[in-house]
From Swiss-Prot:
This is Putative coatomer subunit alpha. Keywords: Cytoplasm, ER-Golgi transport, Golgi apparatus, Membrane, Phosphoprotein, Protein transport, Repeat, Transport, WD repeat. Oligomeric complex that consists of at least the alpha, beta, beta', gamma, delta, epsilon and zeta subunits. One of its GO terms (biological process) is intracellular protein transport. The modification Phosphoserine is found at S409, S942. Its main location: cytoplasm. PROSITE patterns: WD_REPEATS_1, WD_REPEATS_2, WD_REPEATS_REGION. Disulfide bonds: none annotated. WD repeats lie at residues 9-50, 51-90, 93-134, 135-174, 210-249, 254-293, 296-336, 370-411. It is found in: Cytoplasm; Golgi apparatus membrane. InterPro entries: Beta-prop_COPA/B_2nd, Coatomer_alpha_WD-assoc_reg, Coatomer_asu, Coatomer_asu_C, Coatomer_complex_subunit, G-protein_beta_WD-40_rep, TPR_COPA_B, WD40/YVTN_repeat-like_dom_sf. The coatomer is a cytosolic protein complex that binds to dilysine motifs and reversibly associates with Golgi non-clathrin-coated vesicles, which further mediate biosynthetic protein transport from the ER, via the Golgi up to the trans Golgi network. Coatomer complex is required for budding from Golgi membranes, and is essential for the retrograde Golgi-to-ER transport of dilysine-tagged proteins. One of its GO terms (molecular function) is cargo receptor activity.
Length: 1207
């Protein structure tokens, strides 16, 4: 038996201590008059209470209420509320020191005893004294309620122990009952008698005499009819009582000074006593012999108490308080696959099947060590079916037990014993025995013969298993991996006082458990991560090689190899984990009983999937688990996954911050409209400009009415039309400065002059007119000012002020960004979230509402309304129907290459590449057109003009020189890493990744928003960009070609939808055919779902149930759940009930077909047809050499060598 100290405080002399029934708190009453509240787990002082004058002796918590009572030398019994930290009231009545005070376990009573030779019972609710027990002739040192009966025991310096019967008091204070007249008269008579001769509410039942000197303490046994007493005669006496008598059983002798306090062990047949001889002694209740003595050098013990529920004791002494327990409560156990071997409280080895929940006793180890000390550890050898147990009794002993037979619980005769502090198996037929005193390890065989003795190189505290032929040596500051064959340390790791080691399933990692830390290391003791806890760590178990579950006193937690930790659940009691599999955890409790419970592993599985970059698992957990909470959101932000955190948040402000963090400006815009606060719009404007998204920046500036910033934005993006509107707005606002600024941006000279005249700034107006050659206007200003030209001395005037003319309509595009490589998870997540958005939209709209939306979207998009008015809900995105050329055309730079410095490089560009884009960059537009005509049969190049100029401009950098000289030209290469000029190739702006992340994303968005015309224009622009793009590999070239084919499919499909909307109710049969053609197109899943649902709705209206059923089956393949799946199932059900079509239409779903863009009719695989080599559109015969209506570039039926994007 050993004293395991859990907490110790340092203070002045402590006279009393009390455990809280549920919280890890103790109250200590000090001799200096102060009361302290401690958290004994954390070792922290929580509060102090001052209210007594003089020493405080009695202290006790209430069992259920937030109250405690204290009694001191100021004769007061104080009742406190520890939550409000206030003294509620004082109970006055005692005439001398109050020694003990305590609460009744059931009634609102407080029991107190005093040096005034009385015992008082108080009702703390009514704050009255309800009984005074007199009879002792000296100080009453102790009084206590019986745990279950209506009895009180008291001890006094009059050398007696008295037992009081308070059943009368209980009946008197019980709930009132109806009584007859006779009972009422009898009660009145008794009341008169009590006034004359004293109360009979509490009467002395027994007077126990046996002590030779004063009695300091007495206590009832929790369950047996026993009483314990201790006194100044240095004896601890045991008494037994019955209903009619009480007598002394025996005396425990051994203390050599006054015994201050004593108690019964609540769970074992032991007695504990505390004495002024500076010892705490443990006695055998049955034999009344001393079991163990715990001594302090300088502190006398004054009080000892036990926790009402846990196996903890607290003792008050001269230097403070200590909390301790007498034995380790961790059951010795070992796991072999699904079989758990453990030692129960009866010291028998039990084999427990975790899957079947069946237990079998296989051996007994009652004779191992001391009767009061359970085995400390168990090591199991599954090959030989033997177990090795160790105990700390007798300076360390081990026992080798055969557990293969299913015999009775009697000890086996062939058990082998020997001295040793630790013993573990290190091979199939070898085990190691560690001696702490000798610092040696003996290797023994199963017959207990020593085969090898190893002297350890370091002072070792414990040894642990570390694989066959290896052990871990735990020292005070380090852990060593020790090779038993080579007798040397292989590797070391700095860790203080490692208590337990838990190996992973494949023995590749280990968790080193200390008192407050966990170190996770590799097999060679290389650190992976470390975890620190403020509460003691009790056990750990591996779920798999990357997840560790560990238990503290209060919680079950997890740890990942990245160092991430979290709480899985709160534990009602301390558990020792033995195995975890899936969502089941198996453990042993402190009663050495196996328990199992379910956990929710979603949180650590989610984090583990992120750690492994298993995005499919992450997506699955998001869709099927209830992952919520600020902790998950903060974790995702910390780990750099704001786009995932965005899916968990509902609060608009938090979603807005996350959207900005992950660069999702479209979502941020929607949220800004919801929040609608100036600071939010300002944040969005700043981020939009940082990302080069001038379209969203324009919306934010409109919302904030930043007119100057809007004007400048339109200037740098070349949007002259909106600059003109800004000038009109400035005029309406009477903002002269803004109007002048916009006239500068627009280069409107006459407007500037008029503004300056209106402002009375005639000199500047005159200079402006003269410098821009407006002589007539200059003369008008002079005449208005009564001046002549001779009177004015003009400075030398420079050239007229002009604004640059934009080469490209840059306001139609946002600034291009580098495309990040989207993971499988991000793509799946984006597609899934867009699908959910479509489904929610379809849930909210009825068919009639959807038709109204369709009708409204058939019209051409109106021009932007006056910017001074409120901003519309959504800006018109996409390409304009007509491309307006700038007022001043850009001069074509197709001069003779020999006239330029560096013309050799341009020649090399054309020589090194057969691609049209490289010839465009060289300035040889004619050669590029010939290449496109030869490769893809292009015949109409006017739509490519803007793209040609863009490529040409982006391949050069012009450096201005001194006035009068032409600028220096520097050519930009895409293979700048190549040193040889002979292999130079020009830089081609806009690659595949850029097109996908901007134009293609925008086109998808327009389709989703039901903006059909804009979407067609956007897809057509993608064809122009892709046709003159250069690939970095053959694979990328194939992707570009596939992108052109996809754009062609979208344009033809959207043409069918536009034609159907134009027809309306004129030709319902033709409209139904067009809806089928739209639904049969190979589109993205989210767009195909919309098309199929529209076609199903149209089929139901015209009673084509058979065709609707076929479309329903296709829809069900794309949408397995949600409203779309419900609509598909309804269509299939109606088709099964009525498998007929009311209209015969030109549509065969079982034959492969393409749609002719000219006639919007099917072209089946067996028909004659012509193809556009540019976009791949298929036409009926009869349109050869006409311009393709899909791409507007290629010639129908023109032959070419094929698309080429990689050289």
């Amino acid at each position: 038996m050993e004293m395991l100290t859990k907490f110790e405080s340092r203070s002045s002399r402590a006279k009393g201590v009390a455990f809280h029934p549920t919280q890890p708190w103790i109250l200590t009453s000090l001799h200096n008059g102060r009361i302290q509240l401690w958290d004994y787990r954390m070792g922290t002082l929580l509060d102090r209470f001052d209210g007594h004058d003089g020493p405080v002796r009695g202290i006790a918590f209430h069992p259920t209420q937030p109250l405690f009572v204290s009694g001191g030398d100021d004769y007061k019994v104080n009742v406190w509320n520890y939550k409000s930290r206030k003294l509620l009231f004082s109970l006055c009545g005692h005439m001398d020191y109050v020694r003990v005070c305590t609460f009744h376990h059931e009634y609102p009573w407080i029991l107190s005893c005093s040096d005034d030779q009385t015992i008082r019972i108080w009702n703390w609710q009514s704050r009255n004294c309800i009984a005074i027990l007199t009879g002792h002739s000296h100080y009453v040192m102790c009084a206590a309620f019986h745990p279950s009966e209506d009895l009180i025991v008291s001890a006094s310096l009059d050398q007696t122990v008295r037992v009081w019967d308070i059943s009368g008091l209980r009946m008197k204070n019980a709930a009132p009952v109806s009584m007859s007249l006779e009972d009422q008269l009898a009660q009145a008579h008794n009341s008169i008698s009590n006034d004359l001769f004293g109360s009979t509410d509490a009467i002395v039942k027994f007077v126990l005499e046996g002590h030779d000197r004063g009695v300091n303490w007495c206590a009832f046994h929790p369950t047996l009819p026993l009483i314990l007493s201790a006194g100044d005669d240095r004896l601890v006496k045991l008494w037994r009582m019955t209903a009619s008598k009480a007598w002394e059983v025996d005396t425990c002798r051994g203390h050599f000074n006054n015994v201050s306090c004593c108690l019964f062990h609540p769970h074992q047949e032991l007695i504990l006593s505390a004495s002024e001889d500076k010892t705490i002694r443990v006695w055998d209740l049955n034999r009344r012999t001393a079991v163990q003595t715990f001594r302090r050098d300088n502190d006398r013990f004054w009080f000892i108490t036990v926790h009402p529920k846990l196996n903890l004791f607290a003792a008050a002494h001269d230097s403070g308080v200590m909390v301790f327990k007498l034995e380790r409560e961790r059951p010795a156990h070992a796991l072999n696959i699904n079989t758990l071997l453990y030692v129960n409280k009866e010291k028998s080895i039990v084999s427990y099947d975790l899957l079947r929940a069946q237990s079998t006793t296989v051996a007994s180890v009652k004779h191992l060590g001391s009767a009061w000390l359970p085995p400390r550890s168990l090591s199991y050898n599954p090959a030989e079916k033997v177990a090795l147990l160790t105990s700390s009794a007798d300076n360390g002993v081990y026992e080798l037990v055969n557990v293969s037979s299913r015999s009775n619980s009697l000890p086996l005769k062939d058990n082998i014993k020997g001295p040793g502090d630790d013993a573990i198996f290190v091979a199939r037929n070898r085990f190691a025995v560690f001696s702490r005193s000798d610092q040696t390890i003996e290797i023994k065989d199963l017959s207990n013969k020593v085969t090898k003795t190893i002297q350890l190189p370091e002072k070792t505290r414990d040894i642990f298993f570390a694989g066959m032929g290896h052990v871990l040596l735990s020292t005070a500051t380090q852990v060593h991996l020790f090779d038993l064959q080579q007798k040397k340390i292989v590797s070391s790791f700095n860790a203080n006082r490692v208590k337990y080691v838990v190996w992973s399933n494949d023995n590749s990692q280990a968790a080193l458990l200390g008192k407050h830390y966990v170190y996770i290391v590799k097999k060679n003791l290389e650190l992976i991560t470390s975890i620190h806890e403020t509460i003691r760590i009790k056990s750990a178990v591996w779920v798999e090689n990357n997840v560790l579950l560990y238990a503290t006193l209060d919680h079950l937690k997890y740890a990942l190899m990245s160092g991430d930790t979290g709480v899985i659940k709160t534990l009602e009691s301390t558990l020792y984990l033995v195995k975890a599999k899936g969502n089941m955890v198996f453990a042993l409790n402190r009663a050495a009983e196996p328990v199992s419970f379910e956990i929710d592993p979603t949180e650590y599985l989610f984090k583990l999937a992120l750690l492994r970059k298993d995005y499919e698992q992450v997506l699955h957990l998001i869709q099927n688990s209830n992952l919520v909470g600020q902790a998950i959101i903060a974790y995702l932000q910390k780990k750099g996954y704001p786009e995932i955190a965005l899916q968990f948040v509902e609060d608009p402000s938090t979603r807005f911050e996350l959207a900005l963090e992950c660069g999702n400006l479209e979502t941020a815009l929607e949220l800004a409209r919801t929040i609608d606060r100036p600071e939010v719009w300002s944040r969005l404007a700043s981020d939009a400009m940082s990302y080069g998204n001038h379209k969203i920046a324009e919306i934010t500036f409109q919302k904030l009415r930043y007119f100057e910033k809007l004007s400048f934005l339109y200037l740098i993006t070349g949007n002259a039309e909106k600059l003109q509107k800004m000038a009109i707005i400035a005029e309406k606002r009477n903002d002269t400065l803004s109007l002048f600024q916009n006239s500068l941006y627009l280069n409107e000279v006459e407007s500037r002059i008029n503004i300056l005249e209106q402002a009375g700034m005639y000199p500047i107006a005159y200079l402006t007119a003269k410098s821009n050659g407006l002589e007539e206007k200059a003369q008008q200003i002079l005449s208005h000012c009564n001046k002549t030209e001779e009177e004015i001395k003009l400075p030398s005037l420079g050239s007229a002020f002009t604004t640059p003319v934009p080469v490209n309509e840059t306001y139609t595009h946002n600034w291009p960004l580098l495309d990040t490589s989207h993971s499988t998870f991000e793509k799946s997540l984006q597609e899934r979230m867009e699908q959910l958005a479509i489904e929610r939209q379809e849930e909210q709209e009825s068919e009639e509402e959807y038709e109204e939306v369709e009708q409204s979207l058939m019209d051409v998009v109106d021009e932007m309304s006056d910017l001074a008015e409120s901003v519309p809900e959504e800006e018109v995105d996409g390409w304009e129907v007509e491309d307006l050329a700038p007022e001043e055309a850009v001069n074509d730079v197709v001069d003779d290459a020999s006239a330029f410095v560096g013309a050799d490089e341009i020649f090399l560009w054309k020589r090194n590449s057969p691609l049209a884009a490289d010839h465009i960059a060289a300035g040889d537009f004619e050669s590029a057109m010939k290449i496109l005509n030869k490769q893809v049969g292009a015949i109409n190049f006017s739509p490519l003009k803007t793209r040609f100029l863009e490529i040409y401009t982006a391949s050069r950098v012009y450096l201005p020189t001194i006035s009068g000289l032409d600028p220096l030209v520097s050519y930009v290469r895409r293979n700048a890493e190549t040193a040889e000029r002979s292999q130079a190739l020009p830089f081609i702006t806009r690659n595949l990744a850029s097109i996908k992340s901007h134009e293609l994303h925008e086109a998808y968005r327009l389709v989703k928003a039901n903006k059909i015309l804009e979407a067609q224009i956007c897809f057509r622009s993608i064809i122009y960009l892709a046709l003159t793009t250069v690939a970095n590999s053959e694979e990328e070239a194939d992707e570009i070609s596939a992108l052109i084919d996809e754009c062609c499919r979208y344009i033809v499909a959207l043409s069918c939808e536009l034609e159907r909307r134009r027809l309306g109710e004129e030709d319902t049969k033709r409209a139904l055919e067009l809806s089928y053609y739209f639904a049969s197109a190979d589109l993205q899943p989210m767009h195909s779902i919309i098309a199929l649902r529209l076609a199903i709705n149209a089929s139901h209206k015209l009673k084509n149930y058979k065709s609707a059923s076929f479309l329903g089956n296709k829809l069900l393949q794309l949408a397995e759940s949600g409203p779309a799946a419900e609509a598909a199932n309804r269509a299939i059900t109606l088709g099964d009930r009525n498998p007929h079509d009311a209209f015969e239409i030109e549509y065969d779903p079982h034959v492969e077909m393409r749609i002719c863009p000219k006639t919007l009719t099917p072209v089946y695989s067996g028909d004659d047809f012509d193809v556009c080599s540019v976009c791949g559109a298929v036409y009926h015969k009869g349109y050869v050499n006409e311009v393709c209506t899909v791409c507007d570039v290629g010639g129908i039926g023109q032959k070419g060598t094929g698309r080429r994007f990689f050289a």
